[in-house]
């Protein structure tokens, strides 16, 4: 959990200093933010917890977060990070300065055909990317298409989107009536992709004509026009684009154009940039930018190994990983959209097939394409080694020393205070070895035996701690440490920089905030001579009850 702080009179959340309000929505404000260390600008959507609960839109918010976390495309707004406080969620997103396409059309009127085609090509590329990853937007409209400083289109607002499944039909009527397909406003079943095609047709018409094909202040009349599918085609539109519009705005979804049809249309293919529809979409640039890594090291005063470990950990919320992607994305934006392959897609089915990967010598695999690191074993070797023979030895995956515990970036004294509170609540008994090391026991009400464990707080790195759980036996005499400060751990837990804080709302919002990681990160216990029978299970139950209490 993050806390709001003041920075030169301005609100600071995490590493971001908030500035002016960009807009006000149903659930809260969108403010411009600046990363305190890298200086890059972001858009911060502030979602009030109480408001989203009262409006019953928790599912909508979850969908938007899940989808944006999944996507990496040059024409889809990126979600860098979600920061949680007791009162709000802060969605840290890509910032674009050009405003909405809707406002641009209202101000400038219809767009020249060449420019309209360029924007439409970008929009369709993004929609195709969504559909290939089984997501239907369902609320495409000029208000949800943003423009950057170079007049490139970016699709936003995935709150109404749905994941597609084979054989599944959607029936929910959602979105804006002017852009909704006939089957949506009629409440008929629809598969999903075809409703986005209709909306894209309406957007293309708005770009070319400066008006909407179906419009009326009287909603029943508007619905009648949409169901009829009759719209005016101005004389200045050339015949080629007119045929494309008529194909996209077919009332019968079975006769409506598909993305394949649009891509093959002669008007659409003119001046089509190759990066929008790569020939081999399974291949994304699996490279790490050394210059960006060095910049992160300078800004955060950390080592290259720490940055690499953060990227390989696969934790999208890691501060070093977030800063790296901010640098990469801002560089890409400055180069317009020419570096498409730096924005990788979610792993495809062919990723694990070595034959599908063609990595030039000397290039390191991009962390977004890497599976989680695993301990080396005869049956399970890290795919990282197979894909990257040039990986520095210092980053090689070694046989790890596993731990059972919780990782946190809260202050050490705050962590221990929460531990004492939880133990008291559970009726545990404890003995203080030092300020950060406890021996704890609990009596099993059934057997009458005591289950004992050691709790010790380790300093994993300069920003995070590990609260380690260790099973102990009556015969085991723990070595007492004379140190009164948390000790540095050399365990593999340091490779995973998942932040956690103990906040009352974490448990129910775990999937949104990612603020507490009370996970079991290993199963090898440190007991010198563990007893047979139920001792191990009693120990795990004791750990689970403490983790649950800490999460409340």
Swiss-Prot record:
Post-translational modification Phosphoserine, affected residues: 377, 491
Record field: catalytic activity: L-seryl-[protein] + ATP = O-phospho-L-seryl-[protein] + ADP + H(+); L-threonyl-[protein] + ATP = O-phospho-L-threonyl-[protein] + ADP + H(+); L-seryl-[acetyl-CoA carboxylase] + ATP = O-phospho-L-seryl-[acetyl-CoA carboxylase] + ADP + H(+); L-seryl-[3-hydroxy-3-methylglutaryl-coenzyme A reductase] + ATP = O-phospho-L-seryl-[3-hydroxy-3-methylglutaryl-coenzyme A reductase] + ADP + H(+)
GO MF entry, a single one: [hydroxymethylglutaryl-CoA reductase (NADPH)] kinase activity
Annotated InterPro entries: AMPK_C, KA1/Ssp2_C, Kinase-like_dom_sf, PRKAA1/2_AID, PRKAA2, Prot_kinase_dom, Protein_kinase_ATP_BS, Ser/Thr_kinase_AS
Phosphothreonine found at: 172, 258
Activity regulation annotation text: Activated by phosphorylation on Thr-172. Binding of AMP to non-catalytic gamma subunit (PRKAG1, PRKAG2 or PRKAG3) results in allosteric activation, inducing phosphorylation on Thr-172. AMP-binding to gamma subunit also sustains activity by preventing dephosphorylation of Thr-172. ADP also stimulates Thr-172 phosphorylation, without stimulating already phosphorylated AMPK. ATP promotes dephosphorylation of Thr-172, rendering the enzyme inactive. Under physiological conditions AMPK mainly exists in its inactive form in complex with ATP, which is much more abundant than AMP.
Catalytic site: 139
Keyword tags: ATP-binding, Autophagy, Biological rhythms, Cholesterol biosynthesis, Cholesterol metabolism, Chromatin regulator, Cytoplasm, Fatty acid biosynthesis, Fatty acid metabolism, Kinase, Lipid biosynthesis, Lipid metabolism, Magnesium, Metal-binding, Nucleotide-binding, Nucleus, Phosphoprotein, Serine/threonine-protein kinase, Steroid biosynthesis, Steroid metabolism, Sterol biosynthesis, Sterol metabolism, Transcription, Transcription regulation, Transferase, Ubl conjugation, Wnt signaling pathway
Required cofactor names: Mg(2+)
Impact when changing residue 157 to A: Loss of kinase activity
Subcellular location: Cytoplasm; Nucleus
CDD domains in UniProt: STKc_AMPK_alpha, UBA_AID_AAPK2
EC number: 2.7.11.1, 2.7.11.31
Record's subunit section: AMPK is a heterotrimer of an alpha catalytic subunit (PRKAA1 or PRKAA2), a beta (PRKAB1 or PRKAB2) and a gamma non-catalytic subunits (PRKAG1, PRKAG2 or PRKAG3). Interacts with FNIP1 and FNIP2. Interacts with DUSP29. Interacts with ARF6. The phosphorylated form at Thr-172 mediated by CamKK2 interacts with ACSS2.
Family of this protein: Belongs to the protein kinase superfamily. CAMK Ser/Thr protein kinase family. SNF1 subfamily.
Function: Catalytic subunit of AMP-activated protein kinase (AMPK), an energy sensor protein kinase that plays a key role in regulating cellular energy metabolism. In response to reduction of intracellular ATP levels, AMPK activates energy-producing pathways and inhibits energy-consuming processes: inhibits protein, carbohydrate and lipid biosynthesis, as well as cell growth and proliferation. AMPK acts via direct phosphorylation of metabolic enzymes, and by longer-term effects via phosphorylation of transcription regulators.
Name used for this protein in its record: 5'-AMP-activated protein kinase catalytic subunit alpha-2
């Amino acid at each position: 959990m993050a806390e709001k702080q003041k920075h030169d009179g301005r609100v600071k959340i995490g590493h971001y200093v908030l500035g002016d309000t960009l807009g006000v929505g149903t659930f809260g404000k969108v403010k411009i933010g600046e990363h305190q260390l890298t200086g890059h600008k972001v858009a911060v959507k502030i979602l009030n917890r109480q408001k989203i609960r009262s409006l019953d839109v928790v599912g909508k918010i979850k969908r938007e977060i899940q989808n944006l976390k999944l996507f990496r495309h040059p024409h889809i707004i990126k979600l860098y990070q979600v920061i949680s406080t007791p009162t709000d969620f802060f969605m840290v997103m890509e910032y674009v300065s050009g405003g909405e396409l809707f406002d641009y059309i209202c101000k400038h009127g219809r767009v020249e055909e060449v420019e309209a085609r360029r924007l439409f090509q970008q929009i369709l590329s993004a929609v195709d990317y969504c559909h290939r990853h089984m997501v239907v937007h369902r609320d495409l409209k000029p208000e949800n298409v943003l423009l950057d400083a170079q007049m490139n289109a970016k699709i936003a607002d995935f709150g109404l989107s749905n994941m597609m499944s084979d054989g599944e039909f959607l029936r929910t009527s959602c979105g804006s009536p002017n852009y909704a397909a006939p089957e949506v406003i009629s409440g008929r079943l629809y598969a999903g992709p075809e409703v986005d095609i209709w909306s894209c047709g309406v957007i293309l018409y708005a770009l070319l004509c400066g008006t909407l094909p179906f419009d009326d202040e009287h909603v029943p009349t508007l619905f009648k026009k949409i169901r009829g599918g009759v719209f005016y085609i101005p004389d200045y539109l050339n015949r080629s684009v007119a045929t494309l519009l008529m194909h996209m705005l077919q009332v019968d979804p079975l006769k409506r154009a598909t993305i394949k049809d649009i891509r093959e249309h002669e008007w659409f293919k003119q001046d089509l940039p190759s990066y929008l529809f790569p020939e081999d979409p399974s291949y994304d640039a699996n490279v790490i930018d050394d210059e960006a890594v060095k910049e992160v090291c300078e800004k955060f005063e950390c080592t290259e190994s720490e940055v690499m470990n953060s990227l390989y950990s696969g934790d999208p919320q890691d501060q070093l990983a977030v800063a790296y992607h901010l640098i990469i994305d801002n560089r890409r934006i400055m180069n317009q959209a020419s570096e498409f392959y730096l924005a990788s897609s979610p792993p495809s089915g062919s990723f694990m097939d070595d034959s599908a990967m063609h990595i030039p010598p000397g290039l390191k695999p991009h962390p977004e394409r890497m599976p989680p690191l695993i301990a080396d074993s005869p049956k399970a070797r890290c795919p990282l080694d197979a894909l990257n023979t040039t990986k520095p030895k210092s980053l090689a995956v070694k046989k790890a020393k596993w731990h059972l515990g919780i990782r946190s970036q809260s202050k050490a004294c705050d962590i221990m205070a929460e531990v004492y509170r939880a133990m008291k609540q559970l009726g545990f008994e404890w003995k203080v070895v030092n300020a950060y090391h406890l021996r704890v026991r609990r009596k099993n009400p059934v057997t009458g035996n005591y289950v004992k464990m050691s709790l010790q707080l380790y300093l994993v790195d300069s920003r995070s701690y590990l609260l380690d759980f260790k099973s102990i036996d009556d015969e085991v005499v723990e070595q007492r440490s004379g140190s009164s400060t948390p000790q540095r751990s050399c365990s593999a837990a340091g490779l995973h920089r998942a932040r956690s804080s103990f906040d009352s709302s974490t448990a129910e919002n775990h999937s949104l905030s990612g603020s507490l990681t009370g996970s079991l990160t290993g199963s090898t216990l440190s007991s010198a001579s563990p007893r047979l029978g139920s001792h191990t299970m009693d120990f795990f139950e004791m750990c689970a009850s403490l983790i649950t209490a800490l999460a409340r």
